[in-house]
Amino acid sequence: MALLSDLINLNLSETTEKVIVEYIWVGGSGMDLRSKARTLSGPVSDPAKLPKWNYDGSSTGQAPGEDSEVILYPQAIFKDPFRRGNNILVMCDTYTPAGEPIPTNKRCNAAKIFSHPDVAAEVPWYGIEQEYTLLQKEVKWPIGWPVGGFPGPQGPYYCGIGADKAWGRDIVDAHYKACLYAGINISGINGEVMPGQWEYQVGPSVGISAGDELWVSRYILERITEIAGVVLSFDPKPIQGDWNGAGAHTNYSTKSMRNDGGFEVIKKAIEKLGLRHKEHIAAYGEGNERRLTGRHETADINTFLWGVANRGASIRVGRDTEKAGKGYFEDRRPASNMDPYVVTSMIAETTILWKP
């Protein structure tokens, strides 16, 4: 008698050329991901060869009921770690039937910024540190925490090991390998300062691909937590009090910064970011004011500070970069629930295109 798992793991390529394509898009909140699948006649490796598709935007908060169709434009293909074989995941962005990007489509504007010749010439690299919290499904309280109570104070949990310090490692490792399988440039994982909280890093990725890879890595993570019966939270401050929040520190460099004399270019870029601090904060995630308090390795939301090796700064420059006189910097302001299309393109726009 076949088990459910046997059928889920059926190898389609033994009997058919057909493939399953999972179309993924950002939903109406600008933070939720949605997806649905369709069958195609054979393997596809170029997003331009995938058909556009549509969905009911009135059910995702993205269109009115009387004109509910939203069109999906396939943009980036990844291998599907759940169905495996020649089956794929595809990150899409969203348009009206007339071809206008809908308000939650932040990819379209980001792609325009990244295709600007001045930006493209600088080959912007991004490394994004995505923090997240795993919650118990019934009570929405972090895993490993006593229900309605608290664990011991922070200290033992960051990069910690052991049944009394690390909870959810099976999810973390499953996600790590699934992202590598999918073709996402995931570069590492670690346990975070607050118990039940973890981080993974995506990058270095160039331009628009940083946003595509981060969104699909989030999709894969939420699918894995669904299987595990755990709730995934990107809330920037899931637990009030003396507990670290969750961010999405964004590491950034341009060709000029990576070349000799790059430290001077970095300092000019940071100066420009300081002049547009308010605009960046407004675009860096919902609820970030609960996280950026000046405590727990953050700078106060209303203050712009930068420093070498300073984790209480808005922008941190690494000692290696200072020593080499070239390299990258880290924008520590983005919240864990930020839209990577918005954050990556805005950093490029401010540091390369914007003239104060």
From Swiss-Prot:
It comes from the Eukaryota. The gene is GS1-1. Residues 19-99 form the GS beta-grasp domain. The lineage of its organism: Eukaryota, Viridiplantae, Streptophyta, Embryophyta, Tracheophyta. Its EC number is 6.3.1.2. This is Glutamine synthetase cytosolic isozyme 1. Residues 106-356 form the GS catalytic domain. It is found in: Cytoplasm. Homooctamer. It catalyses: L-glutamate + NH4(+) + ATP = L-glutamine + ADP + phosphate + H(+). InterPro entries: Gln_synt_N, Gln_synt_N_sf, Gln_synth/guanido_kin_cat_dom, Gln_synth_cat_dom, Gln_synth_gly_rich_site, Gln_synth_N_conserv_site, Glutamine_Synthetase. Belongs to the glutamine synthetase family. It comes from Vitis vinifera (Grape). Keywords: ATP-binding, Cytoplasm, Ligase, Nucleotide-binding. One of its GO terms (cellular component) is cytoplasm. GO terms for molecular function: ATP binding; glutamine synthetase activity.
